Amino acid sequence: MRNWLKAMREKKGLTKKQVATKLSISQPYYYDVEIGSSQTDMAYSMMERLAAAFDVPVQEIIDAEREYMAEKTNTA
């Protein structure tokens, strides 16, 4: 699970549906992204869209995703 993504969404006070709407994707697809089941590696375009939706620098998203992938690799 991408805990960093859930934490960022909750910090902004947004629901999954609200984030999905901001990203112009379906709610089920956003849920899959958040739990990490739909994408092994998150596309840069998705990182840019998340950064815009959460009003944070894209580098913050990149760093969080790198950490997530490193943890995922170390536990595999």
Question: Which residues does each predicted region cover?
Answer:
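A short, Lys/Arg-rich alpha-helix, primarily the initiator
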Residues: 1-11
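Residues within the helices of the helix-turn-helix
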Residues: 6, 17, 48
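The alpha-helix within a helix-turn-helix
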Residues: 9, 20, 51
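Short alpha-helical DNA-recognition segment
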Residues: 14-35
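Short, charged recognition helix plus adjacent turn
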Residues: 40, 52, 59-76
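Long, hydrophobic alpha-helical segments
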Residues: 43-47
